[in-house]
Amino acid sequence: MKKRPAQHIIPGMPPGIIIPSDSAQHPRGVDLLTYSADAVDERPGLAVDDALAAIRAVTQAPATPPQVLWLNVSGLADAQLLKKIGEALTLHPLAMEDVVSLRQRPRVDNYDSHLYIPLKILQQDDNALTFNQLSIFLLNNLVVTFQEQTGDVLDAVRLRIRHGSG
């Protein structure tokens, strides 16, 4: 297994500050998946402002049948992007700090407006096992995922949603 680099902790910084690790990968945009019992709409590689505008439009005018939105970010190096998403969706600052802190243990944190679930994903790359962090936020009709690496570990979930079995 590959060993992770040490996490940078800056003494005196207030809690909730987003500081990506040196090994973090830059996101390639965000992916937005909107689905209901009847339809699936995928928009990969969106600018964050476009994705947040689409989320606001759906949440302000609920559709029939109800829709679920899934915002996915792969790569955690862009602190401003992460901060913008966290503030726009009112995600707890300590949970957003934990998104970039790659030594989180799996757990469920219950905040007023959402749940935060950090998980470890085991992957095999070039005969080596690696652990990658997957952070999940569950809100009302909205799922937000942050993947440590730009490779997508959630393709199987998307496939099930596309075929109506997810």
Features from the language model and the residues they span:
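Peripheral, non-transmembrane regulatory/ligand-interaction domains of membrane transport proteins
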Residues: M1-G166
